[in-house]
């Protein structure tokens, strides 16, 4: 006799954490990164990240591993060659390009928490926000604002709304959290219900990785 779908084992929740490959100048960044990694593991939530052993990436991954959590890294061949890959993870996946890396991280994760970081972190944040805006993805994106790091970005987004470049409804896709607990709660909740740019409002957004932008 076949078991019903209700009896099948659910897919574990995983959150992707975007953050810097440096630790930054404020000790608060590293402290919050460690707290986030530990909190994810304690809640049984898997960590998906960029696969690096350095900076906030390494701190978050180490904390999650030490707390017994699942940690999956996705890194490019070039970065493996630069010897920055984290080798002590549950699983490390190596992909060809940065685009492949973003696509795979998106595929593995149920939501995104964005810690302080540099250009790469902003690129990842902006792409996931855009995929949600276009209706190609339906996964929450949360800025974990440590020491006011993301305040200039939040101000810019408000200006983009003011000057007509972003719809007010789409501005809601970028959520702000002031604590680790708040960030996890937001990232594991349904994405805000917004109309999808250029697409029919009744269209059902894809849950996986978009085939094209």
What are these regions (language model features)?
Residues 51, 75, 95-97, 115-117, ...:
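Short beta->alpha connector loops at strand-helix junctions that form conserved
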